[in-house]
Amino acid sequence: MLRFIMSFFGAIFTMATLGIIMCALGLGAVFTFYGRDLPSYQTLSQYTPKTISRVYNGEGRIIDEFAAERRLFVPAEEIPDIVKYAFVSAEDQNFYTHPGYDIRGIVAAAVEAVQSRGSDIRGASTITQQVMKNFLLSSDRTAERKIKELILSVRIERVMSKDQIIELYLNEIFLGQNSYGVAAAAQSYFNKPLSDLTPGEAAYLAALAQRPGNLHPVRQYDDAVDRRNYVLRRMAIDGYISQEVSQSEREAPLRTVQSGDYDSFRSTLPPRGYFTDEIRRQLSRNFGEDEFFSGGLSIRATVDPELQTEAELSLQQALEEYDRARGDWRGTGRTIAAEALANEADWRSALASLDVPRDVALGGRWYPAVVRAVEENQLVIGVEDVQETEAEPQVVPRDDIQWMSGDFFENFAEGDVVLVRRMTSDSDGSFIRWTLRQVPQVEGAFMAMDVDTGRVLAMQGGFSYQSSELNRATQAERQPGSAFKPFVYAAALDSGYTPATIVVDAPIEIDTPQGLWRPQNASNQYYGPTPLRTGIEQSRNLMTIRLAQEVGMDTVKEYAERFGVYDNMGPYLSASLGAEETTLYKLVGAYAMFANGGERVEPTLVDRVQDRYGDTVYRHESRTCVDCSIPQLPAGEAPQIDSNRDRIMNAVTAYQLTSMLQGVVQRGTASRTVNLPVPTAGKTGTTNDSKDVWFVGFTSNIVAGCYIGYDTPRSLIGGSGGGFCGPVFQRFMEKAIVTYGGGPFEVPDECNFINIDRFTGGRLSDGASGDNVVRECFRGGEEPLFGIQFDGGFAMSADLPLVDEVPQTTRQVRSSDGSTATVGPNASFGTLSSGGLY
């Protein structure tokens, strides 16, 4: 019997042993099979997570940020222990002792889930396993993935420290609110750095690890608090905090940004605008979208915050003034359902959800509001973010909207969403009433930059970025009209003309495939023989066309492309009047080269870009400072900047043209609206039917330009470059010169100054004086004799006829570099559009 029993148990033992051996061999085979072609865990040592790219102003303040995944990388040594412990207690309490997998943890998690009936659930995967899943494997719920995860976890634990593993985990994990990693989550939920988090706040972040979408701190408040409290209890059990601290933190309410207890980080930044969005557009093109949105770039913008604000307000004021003068009421086009108006919480919630502009501060902040009632003499409104008080009743008196056309009761209805702002007293700022506003249909752009460095100081691409993201400074290509004429005059001055050269202002007829083209001056008058200076000051079209014919449109085309106004300009005469399309960005950049004496300068919105490691990968400024390293320069001496920029225009030509453009401001088409206390030059531009109006002007330091027009071109009633854009330039520059100053334009050594009669172009004596006298710069050898210097392409006599056809002769002239050139009837007549006017 004993022998039988021994034999029976021996057989069982043998079978068990064989079973264990077979299981071991099977497991070994499985692990060998799945462990052959696993991803290399060594890539984790070169972990470069997707991180936020941030834009800073010159003062080092963050003004915008861009991210595919909003992540702020923090090394393990800078992550507070309380944060690490919170996640360990929530996700992997044996993290610091297990070899990558945790049998006890799996069993304990299952027991807790059963005991709590599913209310207390912690992950069965270790933190190491989660790292493997997130970095090297897919998220498939398959046995194969779990086996690979286990194998990789064991391997990684052998080569990486626990701190290295938890660094990967805490920087990669998604925690809701577009927050990746604990640092971004701490900012999103509490607007705090990690070092300032309380145990309860750290516990809430850890609670989000498994179900970030189901534990919103407002919408799922009770669930969020329950899960936070579970983590706090675990932290006490694991010995990371005391029972007293755990109890105190569990009793505290959950306060977050989302519940309104803390200001959001985004609220500390200015609203996104045209400037930073253009940086996004340009750098995404230059660096690639992946690097821009995920590379953790540090971008130093050129923007001057005060001037940017002034650019916004100056342009907005001009656009609103024109819109209100038209009297058309359009509103926002948004409405709120009538049933929501009965309850304040309902209409406030509905109003907050609407996509209406909230970035306008013209005359004070503009608020979205809903019309709650249309009464006989007023609109009763509800204003977003503002509680009604006896001192500030939320009504708009009917008298406030007398500027509108149409019937009061037809213009408004209950539920209409409108924009309003406070009207306040100029003397003491006290509240007067709420006043109705609207985003204009007419649009425009403004841009200002440093003439020497190309640094764009301000850029406004429309009335409101939130209303329309189209940047009309860089993306809207429109006809510049007469704002292009300086490039025709530059070509002429470099071809032997002088500011005193006489050109005939007389009718011209040109036979084209589309018919006979008869260009005219804006005044529909002809002025006969006229000096070049007067031609540009008064924006004479016929003189410009004659110049373009004489110099040759191929030469004008070359100048326009050299200055960057166009990439490929058609060599047609109508283009000399600004008939081809360009952008404000290009035109302002081109004018800067007049102002700086003819050196190439490229507009830039960015001073420098640094990568995630702090290495500079782009710097705009290429000039070098010769003596900046000297501790102290002699009194009155400034550092010497060695310019290595290309010269694209003769310095004398640049000065002559600048002087002539000063005349535009002093007595020409901009004289009524531009009047600064420093020397100023510029040119107006107005196209046919006033569909586009421009003004581009400059001082010795800053060049700025304005464009106004409808996105779908149509006439601006009574519009002109001087009348519409001149005031925008004036308001902006009044502010700019306070900071940047201004002085006389630099005079080249080659200039010989001679008194000229600006009406006749004749040379005057050195002692001549009067309104007709202007001191003109001439190159050596080009000084006129006493009398009048005529354009050699036209026969001039006492009985000069107003010719209607161009001469058929050519002539030799001396250009600015001393060489000779042949000019004459070189124009090529192609398809002609209407072109510019004045």
Positions of PLM-derived features:
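N-terminal type II signal-anchor transmembrane helix
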Residues: 1-56, 94, 114, 322
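Active-site-proximal helix/loop microenvironment
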Residues: 253-254, 263-268, 302-304, 562-628, ...
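Soluble, non-transmembrane domains of envelope/secretory-pathway proteins that act on or interact
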Residues: 263-264, 336-350, 373-377, 384-387, ...
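Conserved catalytic neighborhood of penicillin-recognizing serine enzymes
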Residues: 115-141, 195, 262-266, 272, ...
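Short, well-structured active-site flanking segments
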Residues: 96-106, 180-183, 242-245, 470, ...
